[in-house]
Regions:
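Rhodanese-like catalytic fold shared by cysteine-dependent sulfurtransferases
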Residues: 1-23, 30-81, 88-132
Length: 132
């Protein structure tokens, strides 16, 4: 196992949505979902939250991430793909994941370009109007 964050493309992350040994973690804050909507099949675990017009840490990030990981314990080995709006916060979240998941059961990836690249590539999102 690797204890470094690997960079990957949105196309590779999209392919991972169909892999039972992988999970895509969307770390955008809920307010950002209105821009592009979430990725169907991704786990929505915000890295930061907007409070009083400021970005603050999501106190539940680690716990929510561990829930996704514990769901995959039976596979023994899996891949986590982190995505945000542009690829910066997802890299921070991926670093945190490496700190949390020190047992060597997963590879951690940052999706370069984030949702900006995802949308440019024509990959699917759920329109925000359908989230109601």
């Amino acid at each position: 196992m690797s204890y470094v964050i690997k960079e990957t493309t949105c196309q590779q992350a999209f392919a991972a949505l169909n892999d039972c040994n992988s999970a895509v973690i969307d770390v955008r804050c809920p307010e950002e979902y209105a821009l592009y909507g979430p990725i169907p099949g991704a786990h929505l675990i915000p890295w930061k939250m907007i409070r009083d017009d400021m970005l603050v840490d999501n106190a539940h990030f680690g716990c929510d991430l561990e829930k996704v990981v514990s769901y995959r314990k039976d596979t023994g080995y899996f891949h986590l793909y982190f995505i945000c709006g542009s690829g910066n916060r997802s890299c921070e979240a991926a670093e945190c994941a490496l700190d949390i998941l020190r047992d060597g059961r997963c590879e951690v990836y940052n999706v370069v370009g984030g949702m900006d690249e995802w949308v440019c590539a024509g990959l699917p999102t759920t329109p925000a109007a359908l989230l109601g």
